[in-house]
């Protein structure tokens, strides 16, 4: 398959290459004849060989020109707190524990541990902290010290495509699909009968409450789509890849769900078969609306399916009471990817497969250790202890429960709660890489 010439400039440069090649052959015709005579080889054979080499060289040059001229791909990352990312930079060292994530560390830290940027990935991120732009680095998470899926995704995509890319990120913590990201074609959220009766019991004005909810419906949908349009319009001016480049919207990642999963008012039958069907319908409509509003009817979309806690089948006994709710919601999130109308253009990624079961077990043991520490410190014998003695008691209990290696693994791997994927850089980078692999399969 021959490379495609994308512009008149490419045609002109290729023509120049061919003209030079022809001139070289003409200039070397007499020396080639003498060489062929001395080597007892036909001039036609040598001439044909040089033509073939010249042709291949021209194709190679054209391939390079085609890569340079091809539009720069732009990917949108949108969702709530886990798309923001709560993995603290102090957990980055744990990336080295996994061959999949280990190479990422060298992209954001040099040999001395100082932070560096990945110049091939440009980011425009809108979140609760405002607008942040620049080359991909630590700090595009929920705060300056945190990362989200953008790190693993950006590194993997730019390497796989072997060209610069742009990420447009829009994420806010605590946001729902049923109201905050509600697709415009679904109309404003309307309270169900159970919610109306609850409002009346609380002595609240139902009409006023409905008006407030209607006003909030789709607010963050509009925020995110406006951010995408504005960012695309400014890329030629702001991105470091040159004003002469073209940019094309190439894919979108949706990573949200917690606020819908825990809302028993909106989903009163949650945990029951079909209890989250409304979420599936809303997400299907959201995808259609997004494609229409972004003028990208076949935009590849990856659904990041909620997976905090890991696979439900591996839940401990104390987690089993959540199993039905968690699994039914995950199934509802993934459902749109199974629709025939979205075949080959929407894929679901089960982020539960990126979970770290070792960290789960260590965190579980830490809870019991903390309970033991609190009980001992409240005992009559411990009330008279000084600060140093209390610290010694904590250390004694810790060493009884954990080896030093286990304790180091826990401290270097966890920085947040389970619903934020433990604030683990290793988990978050795995998720980003998984998103990239799914996206690459659709490009």
Give, region by region, the residue ranges found by the protein language model.
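Cell-envelope and extracellular/periplasmic
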Residues: 69-443
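Bacterial N-terminal signal peptides that target proteins for export
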Residues: 41-57
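Aromatic (phenylalanine/tyrosine) cluster motif
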Residues: 23, 33-35, 55
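Hydrophobic h-region of N-terminal signal peptides that target proteins for export
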Residues: 59-67
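Serine residues within intrinsically disordered or low-complexity segments
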Residues: 7, 21-22, 38, 42
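Short, intrinsically disordered low-complexity segments enriched in Ser/Thr with adjacent Pro
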Residues: 2-11
């Amino acid at each position: 398959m021959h490379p495609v010439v994308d512009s008149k400039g490419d045609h002109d440069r290729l023509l120049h290459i061919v003209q030079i090649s022809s001139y070289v052959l003409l200039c070397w015709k007499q020396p080639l004849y003498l060489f062929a005579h001395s080597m007892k080889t036909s001039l036609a054979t040598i001439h044909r060989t040089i033509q073939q080499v010249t042709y291949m060289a021209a194709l190679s040059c054209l391939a390079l020109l085609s890569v340079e001229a091809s539009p720069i791909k732009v990917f949108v990352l949108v969702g709530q707190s886990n798309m923001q990312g709560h993995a603290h930079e102090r957990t980055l060292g744990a990336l080295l524990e996994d061959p999949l994530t280990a190479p990422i560390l060298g992209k954001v830290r040099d040999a001395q541990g100082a932070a560096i940027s990945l110049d091939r990935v440009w980011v425009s991120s809108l979140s609760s902290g405002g607008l942040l732009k620049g080359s991909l680095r630590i700090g595009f998470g929920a705060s300056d010290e945190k990362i989200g899926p953008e790190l693993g995704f950006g590194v993997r995509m730019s390497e796989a495509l072997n060209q610069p890319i742009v990420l447009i990120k829009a994420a806010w913590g605590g946001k729902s699909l049923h109201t905050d990201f509600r697709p415009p074609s679904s109309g404003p959220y309307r309270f169900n009968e159970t919610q109306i009766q609850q409002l009346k019991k609380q002595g609240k004005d139902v009409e006023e409450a409905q008006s407030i909810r209607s006003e909030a419906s789709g607010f963050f949908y509009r925020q995110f789509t406006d951010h995408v349009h504005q960012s695309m319009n400014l890329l030629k001016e702001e991105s470091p890849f040159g004003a002469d480049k073209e940019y094309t919207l190439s894919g979108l990642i949706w990573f949200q769900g917690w606020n819908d999963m825990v809302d028993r008012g909106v989903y009163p039958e949650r945990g029951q078969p079909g209890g989250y069907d409304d979420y599936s319908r809303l997400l299907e409509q959201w995808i259609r609306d997004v494609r229409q509003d972004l003028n990208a009817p076949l935009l590849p979309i990856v659904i990041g399916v909620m997976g905090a806690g890991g696979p439900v089948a591996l839940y401990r006994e104390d987690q089993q009471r959540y199993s039905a709710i968690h699994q039914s919601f995950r199934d509802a999130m993934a459902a749109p990817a199974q629709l025939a109308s979205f075949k080959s253009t929407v894929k679901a990624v089960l982020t539960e497969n990126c979970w770290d079961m070792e960290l789960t077990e260590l965190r579980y043991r830490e809870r019991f250790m903390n309970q033991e520490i609190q009980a001992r410190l409240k005992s009559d014998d411990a009330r008279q202890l000084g600060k140093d003695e209390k610290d010694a008691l904590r250390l004694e209990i810790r060493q009884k429960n954990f080896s030093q290696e286990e304790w180091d693994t826990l401290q270097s791997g966890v920085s947040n709660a389970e619903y934020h994927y433990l604030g683990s850089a290793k988990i978050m980078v795995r998720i980003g890489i998984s998103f990239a692999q799914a996206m690459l399969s659709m490009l």
